[in-house]
């Protein structure tokens, strides 16, 4: 019994690693809630329609993912080099934090989108290194549990600054400031929270798995990318998993990133949207912990398909969404499964790759994840513009989940 308890007791380094999830998740929550509202206000001031607003927001998200897709493998291979991972991780965090603050200085929609792209690329770049740190922070037998706790505490911890920011925005008039000023303060508060929660990891992390420093490191990184891609032909499990992950997680991130923009385009009440997404974070906390515990009883090959099937149902439900109460139902169900699918995918991948090449492989992982979500956002944006219906755009995401489910079953049999 004591051994079982000891197994789930986090080390100081594991706690520091999890704390970064608490910090960056605050930025993720802001991107999913208040930042689209900020952009919507600027877009309306610039004469954009609701459909154009949703489309341009989707195009900006697509631009981020294309840039991330190009940079991730390069950053990932550099990260595997001795003493490279922490400095480049620190730089990416700095880019994200500075960009988060700078968004509040934009007065028109186009500069705002450009700064948003800058900040989101920094955030996405930091995750290449953060995810690859998992193999240095803990051992394979603890990866599912630690990864799940990272997402779980990230969800609930991100609510702390968000509640403060939400109170500022909703109560701006009562404290004598404009809503735009309140949004500026929200961006600053989130940036400070992100920075402060990063410091323990920067102090404690030491790279355990690495390759030695070589001359012409950048040139060598491209050579190693080529070698890894060739090796994927031999490692069929990793190859098929990445193809499956490319599809299903693309749909997951699109739903998360565009939820507020989608609800706003449908004309739903802004306050209701924000509170519903806060509920998503609260529901996601225990749900992620539950999936972490279930991973000790059932293999990820069983749990991940359950999550994919649930998201297919979410996309289908979104196609018929018209009323505020339906958005609340959607928010709760998304919260139930988003932690499980993200955490189990990350830990499952960490267990099937060489630990000394974790940065290199997680560079590919991020291409197929956050770096590949341009497909989902493009489906939503193009579908919305062609049909004039946001429901059609979001509902079309079900294709990604069906294909992802089939490919994952193939990978699990390899």
Predicted regions and their residues:
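Helix-loop boundary and gating motifs at the non-cytosolic
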Residues: 7-65, 237-269, 273-276
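Helix-to-loop junctions at the C-terminal end of transmembrane segments
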Residues: 70-84, 286-300, 384
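Glycine-rich segments within core transmembrane alpha-helices of 12-TM secondary carriers
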Residues: 147-169, 366-376
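Juxtamembrane intracellular "pre-TM" segments in multi-pass secondary transporters
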Residues: 2-14, 206-243
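A membrane-interface helix-boundary motif in multi-pass transporters
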Residues: 50-52, 169-192, 382-401
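Structural signature of the two symmetry-related core transmembrane helices
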Residues: 87-102, 302-317
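Helix-loop junctions at membrane interfaces in 12-TM secondary transporters
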Residues: 103-116, 319-331
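Multi-pass alpha-helical transporter architecture, strongest
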Residues: 193-204, 395-414
């Amino acid at each position: 019994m004591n051994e079982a308890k000891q197994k789930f007791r986090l080390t100081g380094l594991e706690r520091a690693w999890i704390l970064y999830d608490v910090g960056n998740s605050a930025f993720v929550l802001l991107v999913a809630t208040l930042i689209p509202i900020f952009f919507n206000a600027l877009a309306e001031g610039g004469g954009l329609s609701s459909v154009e607003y949703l489309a341009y927001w989707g195009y900006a998200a697509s631009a981020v993912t294309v840039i991330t897709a190009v940079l991730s493998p390069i950053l990932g291979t550099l990260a595997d080099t001795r003493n490279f991972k922490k400095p480049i991780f620190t730089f990416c965090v700095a880019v994200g934090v500075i960009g988060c603050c700078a968004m509040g200085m934009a007065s028109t929609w186009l500069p705002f989108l450009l700064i948003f792209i800058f900040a989101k690329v920094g955030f996405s770049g930091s995750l290449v290194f953060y995810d690859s740190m998992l193999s240095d922070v803990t051992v394979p037998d603890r990866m599912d549990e630690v990864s799940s706790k990272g997402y779980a505490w990230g969800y609930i911890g991100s609510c702390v600054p968000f509640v403060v920011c939400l109170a500022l925005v909703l109560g701006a008039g009562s404290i004598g400031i404009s809503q735009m000023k309140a949004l500026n303060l929200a961006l600053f508060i989130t940036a400070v929270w992100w920075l402060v929660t990063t410091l323990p990891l920067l102090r404690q992390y030491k790279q355990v798995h690495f390759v030695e420093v070589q001359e012409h490191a950048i040139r060598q990184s491209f050579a190693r990318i080529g070698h890894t891609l060739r090796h994927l032909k031999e490692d069929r499990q990793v190859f098929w998993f990445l193809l499956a992950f490319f599809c299903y997680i693309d749909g997951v991130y699109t739903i998360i990133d565009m939820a507020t923009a989608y609800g706003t385009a449908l004309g739903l009440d802004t306050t209701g949207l924000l509170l519903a997404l806060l509920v998503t974070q609260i529901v996601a906390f225990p749900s992620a912990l539950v999936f972490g515990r279930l991973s000790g009883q059932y293999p990820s090959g069983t749990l991940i398909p359950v999550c994919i099937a649930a998201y297919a149902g979410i996309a289908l439900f979104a196609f018929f969404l018209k009323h505020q109460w339906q958005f609340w139902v959607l928010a709760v169900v998304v919260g139930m499964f988003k932690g499980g699918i993200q955490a189990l995918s990350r830990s499952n991948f960490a267990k099937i790759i060489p630990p000394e090449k974790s940065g290199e492989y997680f560079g590919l992982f991020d291409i197929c994840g956050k770096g590949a979500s341009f497909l989902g956002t493009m489906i939503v944006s193009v579908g919305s513009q062609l049909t004039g219906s946001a429901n059609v755009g979001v509902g079309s995401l079900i294709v990604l989940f069906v294909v992802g489910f089939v490919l994952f079953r193939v990978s699990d049999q390899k």
